[in-house]
Amino acid sequence: MDLLATVSTVAISCYALLSAVYKGTQAVYAQPSTITSMSDDLLGSDLWPSVDVIIPCYNENPRTLAACLASVATQEYAGDLHVYVVDDGSGNRDTLVPVHHAYVDDPRFTFIQLGKNVGKRKAQIAAIRISSGDFVLSVDSDTTLEPEVVTKLTERMRDPAIGAAMGQLVASNRTDSWLTRLIDMEYWLACNEERAAQARFGAVMCCCGPCAMYRRSSLLSLLDQYETQLFRGKPSDFGEDRHLTILMLKAGFRTEYVPEAVAATVVPDSLQAYLRQQLRWARSTFRDTLLALRLLPSLDRYLTLDVIGQNLGPLLLAIAVLAGLAELVLTNNAPWPTATIIAGMTVIRCAVIAFRAHQLRFLGFAVHTFINIFLLLPLKGYALCTLSNSDWLSRKSVSVPPEGKKPIIIANPIGRPTVSSVSGESHHTTGRSRAPSRLARSDSVHSAD
């Protein structure tokens, strides 16, 4: 039985060494760098690019959607802004009507109603194909934006080498429970450590869906690949943000992180919902890591360390924990070396995070160690064994409207709102100061049968 103790100790020691190198290097590269902003003389001028905000919506809570749209409508942006709200076959459309009607006099808003649920990816594409802005900002329907998010992201995207950029995510419902507080800390780490370090080399590996901006010219060149993603010969319908980011990097574009562009999103408030989300994300990460491996030779060596740290680290920890538990069960001997190293790493890690964030609340992140070991590690193992499963896992069981092939586009012409008929005519609206564009027909939107 000494073999189990040896395996556990060696594995946890290797894990500690890898974590020290990986997290230490990450902390160095995650330090804020100075990025020059657009000069003040450009503000209010015609040099600001046009931006299309696309908001896919499926069975969203009306109050949550209203908050999202209000935050977009009040963006402090000097350029043309147009908003496309895509209802992806929601079963609660009647409850959303008052939310839509609040913007019937705003010429920047267009509402697209798909005949059936086709998934977030195709809902995005429906709006992308009929919009024309220089940049596309994808926003989740449960997310609210700080007033300068569009401006901050656009400033960073002025470099033509940048294909995508994401903002900093926080939990809008952070104070609801211990779990939402913990997830908010997870988001801070994911953004201000992981993404910030990757952005130092222009290679953010996942521009998160709640708030991500794309250069239209880059996006259109990748749209067919994005729409038809397959895994083991089957359509892959989730992890769209990570896959699109990898496609951007594969095409030679830079991907960035903008911490000043803050977006607040609703996070799971129950353990069951949280684990479903983590399972979906784990499958997506494993799938696209296989694609990302081919990119590593063309990226900075730090990204290789990043991939190793995120994949080999959990494996070493799992081996250490399993061997330690086996030792405890079979010999009644506690794996004290393993437990001591894990406890020490947890204390040091939380103290460093609290110091970097200047927030004592991160000392409570120690709770995450237990969740990681006893829930997330087994979940990742299950995800690895079920990679071909493309179930979204979070779709609410609400009756969907009758199936239809063509979407209905409800546009707001300047001065007078109009609702299109089911048969197809629609009116494409203009931005705040954009010249009137051509009328868009509903059959120009590609929705799945």
Model feature map: region roles:
Residues 1-45, 376-387, 433, 437-449:
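N-terminal membrane-anchoring/stem segments of glycan-assembly enzymes
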Residues 3-17, 304-311, 315, 337-340:
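Alpha-helical transmembrane segments of integral membrane proteins
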Residues 19-22, 26, 180-187, 191, ...:
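Short hydrophobic helices that act as membrane-entry/anchoring signals
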Residues 37-45, 309-391:
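Membrane-embedded multi-pass helical conduit in multi-pass membrane proteins
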Residues 38-296, 426, 432-444, 448:
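Non-transmembrane catalytic domains and loops of membrane-associated enzymes and transporters
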Residues 41, 84, 385-409:
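Membrane-interface alpha-helices
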Residues 46-59, 375-386, 401-420:
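Cytosolic juxtamembrane regulatory segments of multi-pass membrane proteins
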Residues 296-305, 329-331:
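Short juxtamembrane and helix-loop transition motifs at transmembrane-helix boundaries
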